[in-house]
Amino acid sequence: MTQVFQGRSFLAEKDFSREEFEYLIDFSAHLKDLKKRGVPHHYLEGKNIALLFEKTSTRTRAAFTTAAIDLGAHPEYLGANDIQLGKKESTEDTAKVLGRMFDGIEFRGFSQRMVEELAEFSGVPVWNGLTDEWHPTQMLADYLTIKENFGKLEGITLVYCGDGRNNVANSLLVAGTLMGVNVHIFSPKELFPAEEIVKLAEEYAKESGAHVLVTDNVDEAVKGADVFYTDVWVSMGEEDKFKERVELLQPYQVNMELIKKANNDNLIFLHCLPAFHDTNTVYGKDVAEKFGVKEMEVTDEVFRSKYARHFDQAENRMHTIKAVMAATLGNLFIPKV
């Protein structure tokens, strides 16, 4: 019997059905429970995992490393200075070599096409740790965190505030509407999501009963909010746009005034991290000195408030990544979902 996940890559949310995505979230919760109870789950005993990183990372690298070790696998980190992808060696050739040596490959970098080529030519499961277009492993952690807090996903309303064109916004739109979550993008018109992403989300919403809203009107955006979500105003590779983004996105900051507008004491705040909520970073100090802004996408008050769930969310990166690796590489009996 064909197994649902075995041998598959995890490249973008749109590659999976609602049932498959929800299964991975529930499987993540199961693995989290095993971890908390100290029950071994070495589904990948003897496997070797390549971790390819063009972009720097704290959570993704730590999550893949600890998840692989918990599963009994050996993770091998290959940073930007260790791999030749497209420079001295084509992605196709690199993929064919790594596929002979490793049982699975994680890639975190810029190009979605590159992670797709790794999957096409390596012959082993490839997992997208982040590209400029999509962030699917983040979505499993995000929606697991939401389900842990509300007991469900369908009918929940998530409001994303900030740069509506980035990979996290794309993924929240598609993954959310796939599973019946209402997704509001609160963003300036200049940073609205790409039309094809919104169209895809609207197609999913028709099937799941969710709705999509893209607006720069704060009152429309916060209506019915259960979850506020934000991300950095400047993505990796866009550091030259700090001034422009700070000025453009200041009205879209998640602060206590915005939280109170939702009139929902049970709402939660999420952030994929890192967050610029104070001046305790080099970036934070630099922005404060140059633009007089001490808090960017979220205020320190909200970041440390009772609404905050971002550290639970960060922990869930590990549990959800573990679920993806185990499901696609562990020869588990998952005949259908």
Swiss-Prot record:
Residues the record lists as binding carbamoyl phosphate? 57-60, 84, 108, 135-138, 272-273, 317
PROSITE patterns attached to this UniProt entry = CARBAMOYLTRANSFERASE
Q: In which pathway does it act?
A: Amino-acid degradation; L-arginine degradation via ADI pathway; carbamoyl phosphate from L-arginine: step 2/2
- Give the UniProt subcellular location, in the record's own words: Cytoplasm
Quote the InterPro entries the UniProt record gives: Asp/Orn_carbamoyltranf_P-bd, Asp/Orn_carbamoylTrfase, Asp/Orn_carbamoylTrfase_sf, Asp_carbamoyltransf_Asp/Orn-bd, Orn/put_carbamltrans, OTCase_ArgI
Q: Which residues bind L-ornithine?
A: 167, 231, 235-236
Give the highest taxon in the source lineage: Bacteria
Query: Is Magnesium tagged as a keyword?
Result: no
Catalytic function, reaction form: carbamoyl phosphate + L-ornithine = L-citrulline + phosphate + H(+)
- GO BP field: arginine biosynthetic process via ornithine; arginine catabolic process to ornithine; citrulline biosynthetic process
* UniProt keywords, alphabetically: Arginine metabolism, Cytoplasm, Transferase
**Which GO molecular-function terms appear in the entry?**
amino acid binding; ornithine carbamoyltransferase activity
Which top EC class is named for this enzyme in its record? Answer: transferase
Q: Which Gene Ontology cellular component terms are annotated?
A: cytoplasm
Return the similarity comment.
Belongs to the aspartate/ornithine carbamoyltransferase superfamily. OTCase family.
Which HAMAP family has this protein been placed in?
A: OTCase
What NCBIfam families does its record include? orni_carb_tr (TIGR00658), PRK00779.1 (NF001986)
Q: What does this protein do?
A: Reversibly catalyzes the transfer of the carbamoyl group from carbamoyl phosphate (CP) to the N(epsilon) atom of ornithine (ORN) to produce L-citrulline.
Its protein name is Ornithine carbamoyltransferase 2, catabolic
